[in-house]
Amino acid sequence: MPYTRDGLVAMLRRHGINPTHQRIEIAYALFSRCEHLSADQVLAIVNGRHSETSKATVYNTLNLFLEKRLVREVIVDPNKVFYDPNTDPHHHFYNVDTGELTDIDAADIQVQGLPALPDGVETEGVDIIVRIRSTRPERVKAGKLL
């Protein structure tokens, strides 16, 4: 579904977010494509369109979107974080050769044998990241995806 400015404004308002120009631009960068983006990628997309948005504004807005559950944070490692506009239950493949993150349908992975939880807590979710790499080095050199 293409995201229009009016549609993004309505979505932000439904989630209790004041739709400033910069928040709308950041939302457009995230929701107009079916990709997982880092904060730096969001910043480049937003600033590439026309506006001069600071890195702090992007991080603050992404944190607000996380708090309001508009996006999910996918931490591949401490230095590699993606923001995922797909908030439905699902998991991920992370290609260590290309840095690409792709979705795995939740129904494709069966999680069994979780340990007993301590008293007073409940499971909020289970996030699985399957790290993959090419078994054919020539594909990595050529920049081709698996």
Which residues does each PLM region occupy?
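Alpha-helix C-terminal capping/helix-coil junction sites
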Residues: 13, 66-67
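Short helix-coil-helix linker/hinge
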Residues: 19-21
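Short, Lys/Arg-enriched N-terminal segment that forms or immediately precedes the first helix
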Residues: 4-16
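Basic amphipathic alpha-helical segments that dock to polyanions
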Residues: 58-65
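Pre-recognition alpha-helix immediately N-terminal to the DNA-recognition helix
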Residues: 24-29, 41
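DNA-recognition alpha helix
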Residues: 33, 38-50
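Non-DNA-binding regulatory cores of transcription-related proteins
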Residues: 68-146
